[in-house]
């Protein structure tokens, strides 16, 4: 675990992004992680120079047809610069960003050359970071807590706790989040920070380890003009600290556009312009499409290369809703498709293209040091402990995670208790006890699917952190299990106690203990099942439907609605009833409740032994102990959690490989070639997520 500071830390000013901030005295380890990554000179092993030449990305369709999403792109990104990728929707901005960051889909193939510091190398964790468009954050944590827990799962164990705190505060100041540092992120019932602040928190999480190369997918999407300007200004400040920043931008304002150092303009996957952002005005004017006065330059550039405007004009013209007036605008005289062709052709014959090409050649000749931060250095135990604590805090603060379910469980069990109040040992109590157990272990446990939306949110956070190599799958699965256990114990013991004593089930502490343990195990099995579903179903509505369907089938073969010996043997009896936890729960609870009791007979003075009821009414095997039934349910918890782990690993490793293999097969069959196991010459298939993460976490634990 972390080493506590045993001495008084001395406050020293540290220069970050042009400013001095007080940070606690740092050990040599901290210096190695931080000072060397925040230089004032963009040279040596502290810089990232990225070049791409003749970059082409081809995707395969379902019928084997291929389509070039990107075609012949050439450009570069240097330390200290903010490069913006712009273009209309569908122009290839996100694909280009994914290609440069090694995140292409399995059915996408890349050709051309992408070099980092003059070398073909994978982007390792700590060297490059990727900020997605969606801000998948834990809404119940404060900004400071969010960054703090992220630091703990990545920074080395041997680093002092006070140093980690200082680095977190430094990052908060760097991103301008100090005013909202103690405000919760916000969720469905907690009002939190603004959208722009959430975006800056997402960026702060990825710059915590001081990556040299930062990719951002539409960081200003969905933000108002002020928030978009603040976020972009922050990115510009980060680039001035020696980082190489590349961001895709959809529709920037004029103020935001002025913050860009370089502009890469795309249309239909082709380069329209690449160069200094300030030179784009002159380029469009030289190409015959000058920017009118009082018009936002970025709006004008996108207007020239967005063919959707032709469709709008045609629609309005057909409906007689567009008034045409004489204009000197060249776009009024030609179609947008023709304008795009003219701009693309002009760029490839202009000085801008040859200057960029020469610069790419120059940078490619410089063989810089291979950038590798060594991966996440936190131990597996520290990662698991931190994730468990973070998840526990989230569950305790989110009213809808477990607290609301606790209230519903109490309400339902009180209803059960009043309906079956003091059920007794009369003849009618035999079926009453059986139906009560069936409802408790069938429909009461069924309510656990209500937590599925929260599971989906957890998976979104995990996927974001996993893609950037924060921690492994095993740490997440174990932490999720441990953090939920206290809440599940609390829910089942409180509701189980109410039900047990109100109904008047078999008296005795061991009988009571078995009942609540069996209820806990059953609820936990449902939770584990829903977590496995959440790992493969991204939509919470679909997940609830699938989970409800599976549990409905399990209840049918539980042995109550249809007695065990009457269930059709093929499939339904074997194996369905044996993989249903309802079956084992009812088998155990029937024995727990009825064995040792005697019931009144109908029209006779003789008493009916509970053992007779078990064998002849409920068809229970008395040779199998009730504790064996409980142990089977407990083993199902482990099995479902293992399935949860396997499903995540399958989505990371197997699914991308299968999709890539199928894509290559279809492409080869379409082309009539013989080789069906390799990509075409010059094409490199995008790596699977496992390979991607493995290269980003080289030296760190992958599990």
UniProtKB/Swiss-Prot annotation:
Main location class: membrane
Its membrane topology: Multi-pass membrane protein
Binding residue positions for ATP: 87-94
Domain ABC transmembrane type-2 residue range list: 382-594
Modified residues (Phosphoserine): 688
Stretches that traverse the bilayer: 406-426, 436-456, 485-505, 513-533, 540-560, 628-648
Knocked-out gene: effects: Bushy phenotype. Abnormal cuticle and pollen grain shapes, reduced levels of wax and cutin monomers, unusual lipidic cytoplasmic inclusions in epidermal cells, inter-organ postgenital fusions, and altered morphology of trichomes and pavement cells. Altered petal and silique morphology, fusion of seeds, and changes in levels of cutin monomers in flowers and siliques associated with the suppression of the expression of a large number of cuticle-associated genes. Altered root suberin composition, as well as root expression of suberin biosynthetic genes.
GO cellular component: external side of plasma membrane; nucleus; plasma membrane
Pfam families: ABC2_membrane, ABC2_membrane_7, ABC_tran
SUPFAM superfamilies (alphabetical): P-loop containing nucleoside triphosphate hydrolases
Superkingdom as given in the UniProt entry: Eukaryota
Residue span, ABC transporter domain: 50-293
Glycosylation, residue list: 394, 671, 675
Induction: By light, NaCl, abscisic acid (ABA), wounding, and glucose stresses. Repressed by H(2)O(2) and cytokinin.
Annotated GO MF terms: ABC-type transporter activity; ATP binding; ATP hydrolysis activity; efflux transmembrane transporter activity; fatty acid transmembrane transporter activity; protein homodimerization activity
Alphabetically ordered keywords of this record: ATP-binding, Cell membrane, Glycoprotein, Membrane, Nucleotide-binding, Phosphoprotein, Transmembrane, Transmembrane helix, Transport
InterPro entries: AAA+_ATPase, ABC2_TM, ABC_transporter-like_ATP-bd, ABC_transporter-like_CS, ABCG_dom, P-loop_NTPase, Plant_ABCG
GO biological process: cotyledon vascular tissue pattern formation; cuticle development; cutin transport; fatty acid transport; response to abscisic acid; response to salt stress; response to wounding; stem vascular tissue pattern formation
Family as reported in the entry's similarity comment: Belongs to the ABC transporter superfamily. ABCG family. Eye pigment precursor importer (TC 3.A.1.204) subfamily.
Subunit: Homodimer. Forms heterodimers with ABCG9, ABCG12 and ABCG14 in epidermal cells.
Function: Required for the cuticle, root suberin and pollen coat development by controlling cutin and maybe wax transport to the extracellular matrix. Involved in developmental plasticity and stress responses. Together with ABCG9 and ABCG14, required for vascular development by regulating lipid/sterol homeostasis. May be a transporter of lignin precursors during tracheary element differentiation.
Protein name: ABC transporter G family member 11
Species this protein is from: Arabidopsis thaliana
Organism phylogeny: Eukaryota, Viridiplantae, Streptophyta, Embryophyta, Tracheophyta
């Amino acid at each position: 675990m972390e080493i506590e500071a045993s001495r008084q830390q001395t406050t020293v000013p540290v220069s970050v992004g042009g400013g001095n901030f007080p940070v606690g005295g740092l050990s040599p380890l901290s210096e190695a992680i931080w000072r060397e990554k925040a230089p004032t000179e963009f040279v040596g092993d502290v810089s990232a120079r990225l070049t791409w030449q003749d970059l082409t990305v081809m995707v395969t369709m379902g019928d084997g047809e291929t389509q070039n999403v990107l075609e012949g792109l050439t450009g570069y990104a240097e330390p200290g610069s903010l490069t913006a990728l712009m273009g209309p929707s569908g122009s290839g901005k996100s694909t280009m960003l994914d290609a440069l960051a090694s995140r292409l889909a399995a059915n996408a193939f890349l050709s051309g050359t992408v070099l980092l510091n003059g070398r073909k190398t994978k982007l390792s964790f700590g060297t490059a970071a990727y900020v997605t468009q969606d801000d998948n954050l834990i809404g119940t944590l404060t900004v400071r807590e969010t960054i703090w827990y992220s630091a703990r799962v990545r920074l080395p164990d041997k680093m002092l706790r006070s140093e980690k705190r200082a680095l977190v505060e430094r990052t908060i100041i760097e991103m301008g989040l100090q005013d909202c540092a103690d405000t919760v992120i916000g969720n469905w019932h907690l009002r939190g920070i603004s959208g722009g602040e959430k975006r800056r928190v997402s960026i702060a999480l990825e710059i915590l380890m001081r990556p040299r190369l930062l990719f951002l997918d539409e960081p200003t999407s969905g933000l108002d003009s002020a928030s978009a300007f603040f976020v972009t200004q922050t990115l510009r400040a980060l680039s001035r600290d020696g980082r190489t920043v590349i961001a895709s931008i959809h529709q920037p304002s004029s103020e935001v556009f002025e913050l860009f150092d370089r502009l890469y303009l795309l249309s239909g996957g082709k380069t329209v312009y690449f160069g200094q952002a300030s030179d784009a005005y002159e380029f469009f004017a030289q190409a015959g499409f000058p920017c009118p006065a009082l018009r936002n330059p970025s709006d004008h550039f996108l207007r020239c290369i967005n063919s959707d405007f032709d469709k709008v004009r045609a629609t309005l013209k057909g409906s007689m809703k567009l008034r045409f007036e004489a204009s000197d605008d060249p776009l009024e005289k030609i179609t947008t498709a023709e304008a795009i062709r003219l701009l693309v052709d002009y760029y490839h014959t202009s000085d801008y293209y040859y200057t960029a090409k020469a610069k790419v050649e120059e940078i490619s000749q410089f063989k810089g040091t291979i950038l590798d931060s060594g991966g996440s250095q936190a131990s597996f135990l520290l990662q698991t402990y931190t994730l468990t604590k973070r998840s526990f805090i989230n569950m305790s603060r989110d009213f809808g995670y477990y607290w609301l379910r606790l209230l519903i469980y109490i309400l339902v069990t009180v209803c059960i208790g009043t309906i079956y109040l003091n059920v007794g040992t009369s003849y009618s109590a035999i079926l009453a006890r059986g139906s009560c157990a069936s409802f408790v272990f069938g429909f009461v446990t069924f309510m656990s699917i209500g937590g599925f939306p929260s599971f989906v949110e957890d998976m979104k956070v995990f996927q974001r952190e996993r893609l950037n190599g924060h921690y492994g799958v095993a740490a997440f699965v174990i932490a999720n299990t441990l953090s939920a256990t206290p809440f599940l114990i609390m829910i089942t013991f409180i509701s189980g106690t109410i039900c047990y004593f109100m109904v008047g089930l078999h008296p005795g502490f061991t009988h009571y203990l078995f009942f609540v343990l069996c209820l806990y195990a059953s609820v936990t099995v449902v939770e584990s099942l829903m977590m496995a579903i959440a790992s493969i179903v991204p939509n919470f509505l679909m997940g609830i439907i699938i989970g409800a369907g599976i549990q409905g089938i399990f209840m049918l073969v539980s042995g109550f609605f249809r007695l065990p010996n009457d269930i059709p043997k093929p499939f339904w009896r074997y194996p369905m009833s044996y993989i249903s936890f309802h079956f084992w729960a009812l088998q155990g609870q029937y024995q727990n409740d009825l064995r040792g009791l005697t019931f009144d007979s109908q029209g006779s003075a003789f008493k009916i032994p509970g053992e007779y009821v078990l064998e002849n009414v409920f068809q229970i095997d008395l040779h199998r102990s009730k504790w064996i039934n409980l142990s089977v349910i407990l083993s199902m918890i482990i099995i479902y959690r293992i399935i949860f782990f396997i499903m995540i690993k399958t989505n990371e490793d197997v699914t991308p490989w299968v999709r890539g293999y199928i894509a290559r097969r279809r492409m080869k069959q379409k082309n009539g070639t013989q080789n069906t196991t390799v990509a075409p010459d010059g094409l490199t298939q995008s790596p699977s997520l496992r390979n991607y993460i493995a290269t980003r976490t080289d030296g760190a634990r992958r599990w």
